[in-house]
Amino acid sequence: MLSPFLQTYRAHVTERAALGIPPLPLTAPQTGELIELLKNPPQGEEAALVEMITHRVPAGVDDAAKVKASYLAAVAHGSEKCPLLSPAKATELLGTMLGGYNISPLIELLDDAALGAVAAAGLKTTLLMFDQFHDVKDKADKGNEHARAVLQSWAHAEWFTSRPELPQSIKLTVFK
């Protein structure tokens, strides 16, 4: 039987699609419900649940992002188990959150032998570091190779140079 949360969410998606607009991002309470389903996924819904935690929760400092980052950090650190997300996948997803609540867990994971490289990959494309740049620098100064790689990546602006090249021309319509 489909959970009430998934039924409501799918009705919302259908309603918004009929209007030609995307579904709204998940709220913090909805993200909490999604996490409960991730812990014990209904058969046949596994891919949909992973897609939702990956793409339907806003990044940054939104309340839902805080719930998502907290759960992914717990999975990455091993204090929570998720049959659909390995610690490496949880760390990878933290790396896609652009900044905010994901930064501290990613910096902590730089010290993890198994996940440090994954955390570094996420931090290399994250610019919204705020005051935590110094935490990465301190780790690099103490010999953490993953932190050093992050600093080198930022220094070489790989977050920018790794992006696809813009086309030679872009056709636009300007309305006055």
Task: Please annotate each region the language model reported.
Residues 43-56, 62-70:
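Short, charged early-sequence alpha-helical segments and their helix-coil boundaries
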Residues 21-25, 42-44, 61, 79-83:
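Charged, low-complexity interaction regions
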Residues 50-57, 95, 111, 124, ...:
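Structural signature of alpha-helical solenoid repeat scaffolds
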Residues 28-35, 59-78, 97-111, 128-140, ...:
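Amphipathic alpha-helical scaffolding segments comprising HEAT/armadillo-like alpha-solenoid repeats
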Residues 6-9, 138-176:
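Eukaryotic acidic, Ser/Thr-rich intrinsically disordered low-complexity regions
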Residues 43, 80-85, 100, 112-117, ...:
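Alpha-helix N-cap/helix-start positions at coil->helix boundaries
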Residues 2-35, 40:
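Amphipathic alpha-helical packing elements
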